[in-house]
Amino acid sequence: MLDLSGKHAFVTGIANNRSIAWGIAQQLHQAGAEIGVSYLPDEKGRFEKKVRELTEPLHPTLVLPGDVQDDAQVDALFHSVKEKWGKLDILIHCLAFADKSGLTGNYTDIPKEAFSQAMEISTYSLGRLARGAKPLMTNGGSIITLTYFGGVKVIPNYNLMGVAKAGLEMTVRYLAAELGPQNIRVNGISAGPIRTLASSAVGGILDMIHHVEEVAPLKRTVTQTEVGNTAAFLASDLSSGITGQIIYVDSGYEIMGM
């Protein structure tokens, strides 16, 4: 039976109850892990309030600001993890953003500023968080990120985010190679389309979901819980020989040719 008792898991990217990160946090908690979460700080504190209220049933022992574009804030986050827990076993990276200018129209029209921002938040941040987690994973650990099929194949309106996800998947492999000698495993989950705050920015998300329901072998899209269960598996010792992989949780859509 999957058991994460005694493990400390830090989850980034929870925005609301439709976030895939929320589904992952729930399954890690159910498996016995102690949970910490981050939120994107804003002037009125709305995101912090929302995340605290949502995650209250999980009894998180850490609720921290986590703007990955702010190096000082990232350093402070891991300092707090060290002070509270002393170690870290599981890091969940569920961070992605692209300005609308990078998700509509022609790829050749994407502004340089939008490209840089998307790559920093969606791709570079995995390595940045891994750098902070590395010295805390003294007994090994598991780092898990979320990706999407649009990083491998062209998906309408995914544009800049597809390029960011392609870079993210390669980051998984390079980090796995670097951190493997410390028994730190790094994997990605490529989930099928789910209606989330992030996916709502991508035009035609409902069409994408309906297409998967028609084409995928299971004739449906996946749920937060199914992605969360896969993350819990990858976080556990049951997956101790798996690293550097992208695991598709998409009802089999990825295997279809037509």
From Swiss-Prot:
Catalytic class of the enzyme: oxidoreductase
Enzyme Commission number: 1.3.1.9
Chain residues that bind NAD(+): G13, S19, I20, D67, V68, L95, K165, I194, R195, T196, L197, A198
Binding locations of substrate: A98
Reactions the enzyme catalyzes: a 2,3-saturated acyl-[ACP] + NAD(+) = a (2E)-enoyl-[ACP] + NADH + H(+)
Keyword annotations: Fatty acid biosynthesis, Fatty acid metabolism, Lipid biosynthesis, Lipid metabolism, NAD, Oxidoreductase
Pathway of action: Lipid metabolism; fatty acid biosynthesis
Disulfide bridge map: none
SUPFAM superfamilies documented for this protein: NAD(P)-binding Rossmann-fold domains
GO biological process: one example: fatty acid elongation
Active site: Y148, Y158
InterPro entries in UniProt: Enoyl-ACP_Rdtase_NADH, NAD(P)-bd_dom_sf, SDR_fam
UniProt function note: Catalyzes the reduction of a carbon-carbon double bond in an enoyl moiety that is covalently linked to an acyl carrier protein (ACP). Involved in the elongation cycle of fatty acid which are used in the lipid metabolism.
Subunit structure: Homotetramer.
Family named by the database record: Belongs to the short-chain dehydrogenases/reductases (SDR) family. FabI subfamily.
Protein name stated in the entry: Enoyl-[acyl-carrier-protein] reductase [NADH] FabI
Organism listed in the record: Synechocystis sp. (strain ATCC 27184 / PCC 6803 / Kazusa)
